[in-house]
Curated annotation (Swiss-Prot):
Catalytic activity: ATP + H2O = ADP + phosphate + H(+)
Organism of this sequence: Gallus gallus
The Helicase C-terminal domain, residue ranges: 254-402
Coiled-coil features, chain-numbered ranges: 486-542
Enzyme Commission code: 3.6.4.13
Protein localization: Nucleus, Nucleoplasm
GO molecular function: ATP binding; ATP hydrolysis activity; RNA binding; RNA helicase activity
Function: Probable ATP-binding RNA helicase. Has ATPase activity and is involved in the maturation of precursor large subunit rRNAs.
Region feature (Important for nuclear localization): 533-562
Region (Disordered): 482-559, 571-591
This protein's name: ATP-dependent RNA helicase DDX55
Amino acid sequence: MEAVTEGGWSSLPVALSPGVLRALQDLGFDRMTPVQSATIPLFMSNKDVAAEAVTGSGKTLAFVIPILEILLRREEKLKKMQVGAIIITPTRELAIQIDEVLTHFTKHFPKFSQILLIGGRNPMEDVEKFKEHGGNIIVATPGRLEDLFRRKADGLDLASCVKSLDVLVLDEADRLLDMGFESSLNAILAFLPKQRRTGLFSATQTQEVENLVRAGLRNPVRISVKEKGVAATNTQKTPTRLENYYMICKADEKFNQLVHFLRQHKQEKHLVFFSTCACVEYYGKALESLIKQVKIMCIHGKMKHKRNKIFTEFRRLAGGILVCTDVMARGIDIPEVHWVLQYDPPSSASAFVHRCGRTARIGNAGSALVFLLPMEESYINFLSINQKCPMQEMQPQRNVLDLLPKLKSMALADRAVFEKGMKAFVSYIQAYAKHECNLIFRIKDLDFASLAKGFALLKMPKMPELRGKCFPDFTPVTVNTDSIPFKDKNREKQRQKQLEQQRKEREESEGKKKFIKNKSWSKQKAKREKKRKLTAKRKREEGSDMEDEDMEELLNDTRLLKRLKKGKISEEEFEKRLTGSQSKFKEAAAD
């Protein structure tokens, strides 16, 4: 189903309840988007739906409204511990956002309780909250929801609570599968009743999503909503009001261009995407030092407990910069983002579209800019063909301030900056090697010297990808980097302790080697004789037919060794007698 109409909420073939209409009015949504007008009537008429629509098209309301209407039409009112609807989404940030939207509606329906179940906090708190307040509508991430289904010993039998389930929604289904949640989803589906309505919402259609549709939906109506306008015939996958730009510049110029751009747009709100968590940590700290009077925040997937707080705070800001990885690339609705800046291209073409889609949402205008190296220019044609994503070139600014020496000075002054830079460089190269478009993003074509300059490295790190390579265009600093201290006194104190411990261990190790090397000849000889004696004894016990003369020689050597140990003979005499004894026995054996 592709032909859909837009219009006011009253134009729907099914009437919405007064409370829902009041909530829509409070939110300022006077008209429907195409995905909403296509999905809501079908979902409300008890159909399973599989909806594909471009990012930023208003999919959240397309399932929140039907959920409320279906629960309002229930013949039997839901009890506190009964779950009527579950919304599963891939990230905490998206779950928080959906929960906030839902709150705008449920405040008009006090009889419905809702609960947010996400990682990054104590699961027992979720259990206690559910037991106290209930959860008629659950918004959850897959990992936490699966965990709570299995926690029967904590006084909550969630499997019993979901027997009353009417609606299941899988939001950003393609991302759920991309992030490896397939086994969790299958485990969750096994707990849910078969008689339910299911909605699957996605920005892209993949074979994995198709498999999930077959497994979780019954005779679904498929909805595919495309953008209007000239590009619609080519199924453009980015919003039509999004202006997409690209800039070609060398690796050692890219950071200066980024800072210049951000300084020129200080009053606006930006997302800056990097390829790895380590790059976010490093460049985020650099931007904090170089761009004043602007709120700069960092967020990435390895932040387990801070992410929720940072995301919520940034959403409330009128302006600022959020430095992030692709954890922020999907479904997240941050109000009034003016620019999405992709410092590093993402690992896949579909992720490029989702990053851009963080701006120009629900009919608003927005802009996106991706920085590319000269060797990556063919990526533009690839995006045009693969993702139907039209782009315009933005020329690099001339005579921008060179900030890399300042970044180097920061690394020389603080070991934390130096180490972050090294980790960021290594992680970038490792991520580059795994890029989906490896015909364009080829690691062998990278200018490592220019790249190291762009990271303001003090020296090249040791890593397999650089083994055997020479970098005449890169000059490492003459400073011994081991002497660079941490600015944090506690960290530096701890580092000095570790260095001292390592020094002692090294000295002990060298001392042992020296001791073994300088051990007296007699002790070494004694050790060999002891070993020889044990070998002879073992052979004797095994029934060896050793000659009597050999045994006599061994016993004689042993007697001499005992006399040497007691000091009755000197080492010189011991050596003389030992040699003479062996010669005598050899002569006897020859006769």
